[in-house]
């Protein structure tokens, strides 16, 4: 017996395996899979992603303090149901996965996205519709490209409708109990400061904090005092979007910051606003040198500046980096229960449940070869 397609007015309705298959092939959809493991579903001619959040982000999602930021075009289409993509949500099997999918459903509802939840086990879906099974399980972690459809079959026409812009998902600050946002530069350690564009061009500020090293994490802002022989610059040309992987620059940035420390000086890390790209570099430094988890490093920085908001792809890269450092290699589903080795990162490093990786491309090797830092300016391109 054929099951009728659900009405788009029934937002959040549970659907059968047959309805899922029909919606998947007949409508403009996005599939969000909240399972931490299991059989994969085909991604042909539809945008598909596996939603996996570390503990830090999962807590914010479940607490309602993490919001979905979308592309402007999608916001403009909120009142045009026929043009908006629909979301097919695959809930998780475990208790943690179920909590994640429930929180995501609430988030989708509050942002007025039409979505449906698969009400049958994925095994049932795949047994009834084996063509949905992804032939390449090893490619389970989707690389996010907003201008093309991953896994698009030859000759198939991809949907041209707007997509939920996972590139611009951003971890936004939760309630800080009235804590005022810190003024730049923000002191993270005795030799490491977080700043923005204004900080970087203020000579008095640089002098006040004994800053002689500056990491410029932008592709277009000038190295203002590059001609000063007492100033040293490191440029990491990156924009605040998913097309840039900062992981490969971590080793050189860490070495550059350590050079400032060894010379009894200080290093300023800045981007345009001082909330995303520069924060990512600072987090990587703390994780590597203090051997503390991403959760601990993030909370350390956030307590000093509540306005930090790194985008999800950078957080994903940091999650991969955490794994590469072996900070969570001995656990499955939880962060380490032991406190970080250094007192400077000893911030509530309690074991908290998490779900796998994070909205991120496959891990990128940190094998960028070290370069000499004995000249005043340096650039990455």
Curated annotation (Swiss-Prot):
Renumbered residue ranges of the record's region Disordered: 362-381
Main localization, broad class: membrane
Family matches, as CDD domains: DSP_MKP_classII
Polar residues bias locations: 365-381
Root EC class: hydrolase
EC number from the UniProt entry: 3.1.3.16, 3.1.3.48
Reactions this protein catalyses: O-phospho-L-tyrosyl-[protein] + H2O = L-tyrosyl-[protein] + phosphate; O-phospho-L-seryl-[protein] + H2O = L-seryl-[protein] + phosphate; O-phospho-L-threonyl-[protein] + H2O = L-threonyl-[protein] + phosphate
Molecular function via GO: MAP kinase tyrosine phosphatase activity; MAP kinase tyrosine/serine/threonine phosphatase activity; protein serine/threonine phosphatase activity; protein tyrosine/threonine phosphatase activity
GO CC list: cytoplasm; cytosol; plasma membrane
Record keywords, A-Z: Cell cycle, Cell division, Cell membrane, Differentiation, Hydrolase, Meiosis, Membrane, Mitosis, Oogenesis, Protein phosphatase
Compartments it resides in: Cell membrane
Biological process (GO), any one: positive regulation of vulval development
Active site positions, chain numbering: 271 (phosphocysteine intermediate)
Segments forming domain Tyrosine-protein phosphatase: 184-327
Stretches the record annotates as KIM: 56-68
Function (record text): Dephosphorylates MAP kinase mpk-1.
Domains as described in the record: The KIM (kinase interacting motif) region may be involved in the binding to MAP kinases.
Similarity comment: Belongs to the protein-tyrosine phosphatase family. Non-receptor class dual specificity subfamily.
Name of the protein in question: Dual specificity protein phosphatase lip-1
Lineage of the organism: Eukaryota, Metazoa, Ecdysozoa, Nematoda, Chromadorea
